[in-house]
Regions:
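Gly/Ala-rich beta-loop-alpha elbow adjacent to hydrolase catalytic centers
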Residues: 152-156, 160
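Short beta-strand/loop motif that positions the catalytic acidic residue
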Residues: 212-214, 218-225
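Active-site nucleophile elbow and catalytic-triad environment of alpha/beta-hydrolase enzymes
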Residues: 195-209, 214-215
């Protein structure tokens, strides 16, 4: 009888261990599907959407689409580069362009598109998004010496913070909307039973990045955000050394 009990207990432990290992494996292998929710559309459709919003396609020297922009007629205008959240595509955030342009002919607004989102080719990952964002900023900086400001929304706050750490002299200031300390901290909040720190490849460590930037930063936190816990944004704000 005791041997039978031992076998049942051992079987339950083995089954539980297999379930845990399976969950960990699924999280590790599917993490990008849990982070990125791109909406893909044909470029001709997005060209019509952009035109209705007063935006033009933004392309690099090889004519590849990297986002959307609207330019003022004022050659003294400032430039703002916007990084959206993890879902949809850049044109879903055309309200940023409308908001800046409502102030008058003072801003050239650029809505950056992530690889694999909208009509942009590629697939989203932290490495590829950061590389593409760096290329976009370098493209703007190569045109002229006007100031460039960054706006980062949710996931985009991690991208903007990274760029500020890499170009601390060229980034004139930032607005971070519903930001977080790191994606690892966000994931740890939602998956407390998993060793997220050891599994997550996409980290977007905004807190570490901001330690290398001293320019002006405005933080806009949500009172009850179900995705990005407000305390993470508060921690980022309180720890910012600039």
């Amino acid at each position: 009888m005791q041997n039978g009990l031992r076998r049942r207990v051992a079987g339950q432990i083995t089954l539980s261990a297999l379930v845990v290992v399976g969950v960990i494996y699924m999280f590790a292998s599917l993490q990008r599907q849990l982070i990125y929710f791109p909406q893909v559309e044909p470029e001709d459709k997005l060209l019509r959407v952009a035109a209705a919003a007063g935006l033009q396609p933004w392309r690099d020297s090889s004519d590849a689409l990297i986002g959307w922009h609207t330019e003022s007629a004022n050659d003294q205008s400032k430039r703002v580069l916007v990084f959206h959240g993890n879902a949809g595509y850049a044109l879903h955030r055309d309200y940023y362009a409308a908001g800046f342009l409502a102030q008058g002919q003072y801003w050239d607004v650029y809505l950056f598109e992530y690889p694999g989102y909208g009509a942009r080719t590629g697939a989203p990952s932290e490495v590829d998004i950061k590389a593409a964002a760096r290329h976009a900023l370098e493209l703007l900086l190569s045109h002229d010496a006007r100031p460039v400001y960054l706006v980062g929304e949710s996931l985009g706050s991690g991208v903007a913070s990274y760029l500020a750490s890499q170009f601390p002299e060229q980034v004139a200031g930032m607005l971070l909307v519903t930001p977080f300390t790191s994606l690892t901290d966000v994931a740890s909040h939602h998956y407390r039973f998993l060793p997220v720190g050891a599994l997550l490849s996409e980290r977007y460590d905004a807190q570490e990045a901001l330690s290398h930037y001293r320019g002006p930063v405005a933080f806009l936190l949500a009172g009850s955000d179900e995705i990005v816990p407000t305390p993470l944004g508060q921690t980022l704000y309180e720890g910012y050394p600039g």
